[in-house]
Every structure is written in structure tokens, then in C-alpha cells.
């Protein structure tokens, strides 16, 4: 079966496993965007550590869950978000100002909206988690 959106499938698997109170989830196939998105989630403590397994096919990622994640999702299509419109997107997607993160892909790499605001860069919106 052909996967249309690898990141969306990965985040849906994580969200479903979190709802079922699982401790680990297996994500396949592996992609660079998925790994960077998981790095942002791990940096903020929403997931535990993850391990990338190279099986010479598509690769696998084993993610340890810690029960802190409420919801995560992908925004499709990937809208352009200039710096001055970042507040509009965060207020639409997140439940409150101090809670959750919007993930962007920028010229400086994949980062959350707070880091993008500090670095004063805009980009395309990938997804969110809280």
C-alpha cells in the first residue's frame, strides 16, 4: 500500500497509542521530516526517547510514550506562515497560549513556533501537538 502522507500516519499512530495507554509505538516507514518532528516533541517532553531501526526497506521508529500527549496532528496543505501571522495560527490550533506547540519548517530547519519567533523566521506549517 502506498502511503500518501508519512508524517500524518506517524502522528495518528502516536495519538492512537497514547489514547490506548500504550508505552511504545512502532512507526513505519521512517522519514527525515518525521524524525525532526519527533525531535521537537521529545525536546519539549511530550514523548520519551525514540530509536530508529534501519531494516533496509523503509526503516522503522520505535517511540517510547510517557502519557503527556493529548493531541497531535498534521496541517495539510502546508500553509505559508509569515512571522506576523504566527499568533493567528497558534490561537486557532492550540487550546491556550502557554500550552502546546505548532511545528514549522523554516529555512533554519524544523522548529516550534516559539523558536521561530525568537529567530525571527517564518515558514510552512507542518503540524501541532499539545
Swiss-Prot record:
One of its GO terms (biological process) is translation. GO terms for molecular function: structural constituent of ribosome. Pfam families: Ribosomal_S8 (PF00410). Keywords: Ribonucleoprotein, Ribosomal protein. InterPro entries: Ribosomal_uS8, Ribosomal_uS8_CS, Ribosomal_uS8_sf. GO terms for cellular component: cytosolic small ribosomal subunit. Belongs to the universal ribosomal protein uS8 family. This is Small ribosomal subunit protein uS8. It comes from Strongylocentrotus purpuratus. The lineage of its organism: Eukaryota, Metazoa, Echinodermata, Eleutherozoa, Echinozoa. The gene is RPS15A.
